[in-house]
């Protein structure tokens, strides 16, 4: 039976990073932009944890927990701002964000 090694995790992480990057570049909906950013951050977490496990060091796993904490605070603040924006303007498209200036 085939063993799942470091390369498998890194390939998975690269695929998820590419999906998240395409999502960040192509999406106009702010909620989908948040989801794509979370996919990016979680792909980095997979890389940190896999490399950390491969070398037998816990540093990468600690970085992954730190990134999870930062991502959670980012989502809390971002979704709060998104809800306020939606209540005021009834949409969450990035094209309409230019009215926020001033």
UniProtKB/Swiss-Prot annotation:
It is an enzyme of class 7 (translocase). GO terms for cellular component: NADH dehydrogenase complex; plasma membrane. InterPro entries: NADH_UbQ_OxRdtase_chain4L/K, NUOK/Mnh_C1-like. It catalyses: a quinone + NADH + 5 H(+)(in) = a quinol + NAD(+) + 4 H(+)(out). One of its GO terms (biological process) is ATP synthesis coupled electron transport. One of its GO terms (molecular function) is NADH:ubiquinone reductase (non-electrogenic) activity. Keywords: Cell inner membrane, Cell membrane, Membrane, NAD, Quinone, Translocase, Transmembrane, Transmembrane helix, Transport, Ubiquinone. The chain crosses the membrane at residues 4-24, 31-51, 65-85. It is a multi-pass membrane protein. The keyword DNA repair does not apply. It is found in: Cell inner membrane. Its EC number is 7.1.1.-. HAMAP family: NDH1_NuoK (MF_01456). PANTHER family: NADH DEHYDROGENASE SUBUNIT 4L-RELATED, NADH-UBIQUINONE OXIDOREDUCTASE SUBUNIT ND4L. Belongs to the complex I subunit 4L family. NDH-1 shuttles electrons from NADH, via FMN and iron-sulfur (Fe-S) centers, to quinones in the respiratory chain. The immediate electron acceptor for the enzyme in this species is believed to be ubiquinone. Couples the redox reaction to proton translocation (for every two electrons transferred, four hydrogen ions are translocated across the cytoplasmic membrane), and thus conserves the redox energy in a proton gradient. NDH-1 is composed of 14 different subunits. Subunits NuoA, H, J, K, L, M, N constitute the membrane sector of the complex. This is NADH-quinone oxidoreductase subunit K. It comes from Sulfurimonas denitrificans (strain ATCC 33889 / DSM 1251) (Thiomicrospira denitrificans (strain ATCC 33889 / DSM 1251)).
